């Protein structure tokens, strides 16, 4: 079984708990996305006989990319790899990026799972973590994702948050 992980290393704001590679400077995003497509092309022979079962967009904040750009990555992967057995395509998302319009557009892609970075349902903890959303906004994002047709929605909780203060 093979999977493809695409790391989108950009964030509007850097969270206090995050150890992943990321940048709050969004200016090079277009160039990085183009470089990722180039690397996919270069490394396509790495999995010649494997069927991709999963595509996972992690970060950083993949939900900073328009849904159409995420779909371009999926289409590109399907050109380069055998995706006939694709079982799951996941996008990590911040609650504040998941507007009804964004979710509608994302639902028209092959993305079928959302991993929403809720981190906490406590506003005080969210402030400690330097998160942009509130607990109510997180609840709303999860509900709106389900209403947009996403039947596979997970939301992450970061319990080391109380140790940050």
What label would you give each PLM region?
Residues 22-46, 50-165:
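Conserved non-cysteine loop/helix-boundary elements of the Radical SAM core domain that shape
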Residues 9-20:
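Local cysteine-cluster metal-coordination motifs and their immediate loop/turn environment
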């Amino acid at each position: 079984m093979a999977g493809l992980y695409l790391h989108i290393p950009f964030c509007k704001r850097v969270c206090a708990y995050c150890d992943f590679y990321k940048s709050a400077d969004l200016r090079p995003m277009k160039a990085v996305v183009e470089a990722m497509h180039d690397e996919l092309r270069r490394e396509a022979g790495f999995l010649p006989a494997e069927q991709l079962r999963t595509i996972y967009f992690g970060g950083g904040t993949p939900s900073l990319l328009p849904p159409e750009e995420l779909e371009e990555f999926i289409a590109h992967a399907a050109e380069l790899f055998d995706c006939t057995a694709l079982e799951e395509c996941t996008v990590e998302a911040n609650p504040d990026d998941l507007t009804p319009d964004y979710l509608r557009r994302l639902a028209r892609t092959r993305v079928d799972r959302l991993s929403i970075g809720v981190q906490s349902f406590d506003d005080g903890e969210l402030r400690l973590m330097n998160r942009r959303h509130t607990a109510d906004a997180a609840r709303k994002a999860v509900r709106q994702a389900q209403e947009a047709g996403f039947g596979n929605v997970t939301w992450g909780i970061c319990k080391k948050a109380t140790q940050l203060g």
